[in-house]
């Protein structure tokens, strides 16, 4: 089994869906390793737009079987709603090609309510979550009181554990706008509907042990990783290479490539440090031209210049074998383009390839930039590297050199499925 892993290299929203969609055309399996319906990406295929949240985007490929792995959290109503949307858009057999590990955890509406209450308590220091209940669900998992997907099938166990969860949160927060008996009633229907989707993950993988190509689709990104991201302004799962290996029980020796997806500039949704953020006309232009609004929340994304310090750190953690640089065309109309090359700490220390763990330190760094000339010409839809303007190629090759020679193998030049340059 050859395994390709696609990972976000920044703070998410890099455009992982398109490269995953492209690679899934040759894949037998496509797997989600972590996260829940807080993730979001869009794929345009044959003029139809598909929005993915919890489902793997390999479902667009008719020959690809898909798995939601043990490291994920699944909001069951959203699972069925998203699946129905895909089927309505023409993917009629999607329900026959999607499976869920029995070890994945259930994200309840209760978790979403608690998410909002916890954010409100933080006040001005709120994390800026999606409000989907992901954090509280992973907290319950870590505290060993969560409900696994496989346990939904045992009615008595399921009801006992959900009532216990509700009692615990009621003791903490008081009366909640949540009817646990109503939720239990809804799951009587979901229980029957879930049966054909739930699998033992190891047994499932054994069926595909001779698969020539397995694709792992990362959710979120390295800088949102619970351990390695800008904690506490992170998600609640392990979003890097190690998390994918752990969640899917992958054999590390079978991993043939690790693809880092990185925007040609930088964006972030929600709170937290963002050293290269541009709170000026440049940031506004990136946001406007790039149509930077979250797929899941609709929130306006914060925008800034490409950050080499961040990406060197990301490379050191995830060990990318190749990169996919996305949304190059958004930079088409800039006279000059800046790249962050170093952080200077308040004490004068200059950092180029390490990333401070303390978010308050990150808020105080001064950023050093190099300025590169723009290309002032249209790159949207360009499919050959040699057809790019010289300054666009210079920008790509500068980033490539500064990241230690990790090849930028794919370059996104627009939203459509075929707006991609492949450099062999």
Curated annotation (Swiss-Prot):
SMART domains, sorted: Adenylsucc_synt
Domain of life: Eukaryota
Residues involved in GTP binding: 12-18, 40-42, 301, 327-329, 412-414
Chain sites annotated for binding substrate: 295-301
Residues binding IMP: 13-16, 38-41, 130, 144, 220, 235, 299
Entries under InterPro entries matching the protein: Adenylosuccin_syn_GTP-bd, Adenylosuccin_syn_Lys_AS, Adenylosuccinate_synth_dom1, Adenylosuccinate_synth_dom2, Adenylosuccinate_synth_dom3, Adenylosuccinate_synthetase, P-loop_NTPase
Enzyme class label: ligase
Details of cofactor binding: Binds 1 Mg(2+) ion per subunit.
Recorded GO MF terms: adenylosuccinate synthase activity; AMP binding; GMP binding; GTP binding; magnesium ion binding
GO aspect biological process, one term: 'de novo' AMP biosynthetic process
Listed EC numbers: 6.3.4.4
Pathway: Purine metabolism; AMP biosynthesis via de novo pathway; AMP from IMP: step 1/2
One of the record's GO cellular component terms: cytoplasm
Active site feature: 13, 41
Keywords per UniProt: Cytoplasm, GTP-binding, Ligase, Magnesium, Metal-binding, Nucleotide-binding, Purine biosynthesis
Subunit structure: Homodimer.
Job of this protein: Plays an important role in the de novo pathway and in the salvage pathway of purine nucleotide biosynthesis. Catalyzes the first committed step in the biosynthesis of AMP from IMP.
Family as reported in the entry's similarity comment: Belongs to the adenylosuccinate synthetase family.
Name assigned to this protein: Adenylosuccinate synthetase
Organism: Aspergillus fumigatus (strain ATCC MYA-4609 / CBS 101355 / FGSC A1100 / Af293) (Neosartorya fumigata)
């Amino acid at each position: 089994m050859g395994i390709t892993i696609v990972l976000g290299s920044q703070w998410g929203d890099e455009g992982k869906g398109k490269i995953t969609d492209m690679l899934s055309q040759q894949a037998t399996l496509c797997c989600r390793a972590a996260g829940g319906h807080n993730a979001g990406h869009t794929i345009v295929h044959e003029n139809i737009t598909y929005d993915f949240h919890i489902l793997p985007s390999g479902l667009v490929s008719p020959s690809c079987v898909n798995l939601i792995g043990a490291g994920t959290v699944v909001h069951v109503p959203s699972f069925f709603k998203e699946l129905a949307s895909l089927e309505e858009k023409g993917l009629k057999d999607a329900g026959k090609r999607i499976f869920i590990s029995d070890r994945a955890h259930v994200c309840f509406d209760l978790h979403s309510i608690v998410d909002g209450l916890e954010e409100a308590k933080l006040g001005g220091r709120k994390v800026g979550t999606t409000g989907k209940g992901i954090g509280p669900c992973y907290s319950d998992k870590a505290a060993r009181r969560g409900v696994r997907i496989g346990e939904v099938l045992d009615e008595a166990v399921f009801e006992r554990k959900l009532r216990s969860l509700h009692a615990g949160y009621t003791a903490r927060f008081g009366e909640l706008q949540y009817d646990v008996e109503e939720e239990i009633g809804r799951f009587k229907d979901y229980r029957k509907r879930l049966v054909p989707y739930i699998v033992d993950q190891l047994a499932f993988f054994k069926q595909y042990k001779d698969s020539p190509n397995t694709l792992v689709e990362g959710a979120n990104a390295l800088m949102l990783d619970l351990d390695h991201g800008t904690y506490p302004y992170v998600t609640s799962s392990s979003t890097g290479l190690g998390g994918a290996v752990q969640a899917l029980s992958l054999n590390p020796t079978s991993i043939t490539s690790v693809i880092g997806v990185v925007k040609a500039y930088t964006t972030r949704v929600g709170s937290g440090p963002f050293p290269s953020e541009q709170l000026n006309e440049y940031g506004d232009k990136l946001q406007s031209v790039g149509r930077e609004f979250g797929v899941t929340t609709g929130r306006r994304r914060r925008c800034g210049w490409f950050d080499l310090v961040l990406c060197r750190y990301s490379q050191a953690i995830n060990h990318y074998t190749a990169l996919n640089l996305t949304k190059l065309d958004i930079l088409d109309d800039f006279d000059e383009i800046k790249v962050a090359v170093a952080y200077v700490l308040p004490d004068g220390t200059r950092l180029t390839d390490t990333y401070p763990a303390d978010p308050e330190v990150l808020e105080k760094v001064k950023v050093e930039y190099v300025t590169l000339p723009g290309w002032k010409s249209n790159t949207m839809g360009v499919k050959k590297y040699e057809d790019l303007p010289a300054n666009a190629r210079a920008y790509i090759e500068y980033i490539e050199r500064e990241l230690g020679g990790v090849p930028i193998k794919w370059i996104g030049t627009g939203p459509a499925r075929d707006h991609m340059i492949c450099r062999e």
